UniProtKB/Swiss-Prot annotation:
Belongs to the IspD/TarI cytidylyltransferase family. IspD subfamily. SUPFAM superfamilies: Nucleotide-diphospho-sugar transferases (SSF53448). It is an enzyme of class 2 (transferase). The record marks 14, 21 as: Transition state stabilizer. InterPro entries: IspD, IspD/TarI, IspD/TarI_cytidylyltransf_bact, ISPD_synthase_CS, Nucleotide-diphossugar_trans. The record marks 151, 207 as: Positions MEP for the nucleophilic attack. It catalyses: 2-C-methyl-D-erythritol 4-phosphate + CTP + H(+) = 4-CDP-2-C-methyl-D-erythritol + diphosphate. One of its GO terms (molecular function) is 2-C-methyl-D-erythritol 4-phosphate cytidylyltransferase activity. This is 2-C-methyl-D-erythritol 4-phosphate cytidylyltransferase.
Amino acid sequence: MYTLIIPAAGQGKRMGAGKNKLFLLINEVPIIVHTLRAFEKDKACKNIIMAINEEERPYFEELMQKYPVEKPVQFIQGGAERQDSVYNAIQHTTDVEYVLVHDGARPFVTNKVIQDVLTAAEKYGASICAVPVKDTVKKVEQGVVVETVERSQLKAVQTPQGFSVSLLLEAHRSAKQSCFLGTDDASLVERIGKQVGVVEGSYYNIKVTTPEDLLIAESFLHVQKK
């Protein structure tokens, strides 16, 4: 069994919508509802903890009334940074050995990816899902190319990311003590010298970040309905 943690206190400035992007609609249903539905049928998911901006609590609670979820959902105070929100959520985790941390704006995660991440977390203590990088990647400084990075060793990392509760708590406490801010939770585990298992993600598992992503998401849903 695991607890799903969703840091949902961000404002999504790149979307330019003037509100939390999780409230934006894909096929007339909020992004966050699509995301929750991806997990609610998973028998291994015990409950869901969402770290939110307290000012948005009424909106989230209204969504849960309009779109009920078949799992217990708990709203807690989010932090100034995503990392703070996850740390706060860990404090509310009880009676489970593992947690999965997932971006609320990744509504197309598949059950296979979820199960693969959980299995790898049980094996290694920490796990991520990732896909091979398709594009050529170059390092650029002051407007000119300084290096072409070897693509064969690169992966684009997604969520969910899975962890034993004790390991993730240790990693977060260490980062907090050193004022270290990582780009994801796995980087905090890497920082304390622990292994992170990697499983195959999905190119459909996009993070809806920009207006263009909303159009892509609508297309994905259209294909799924066929």
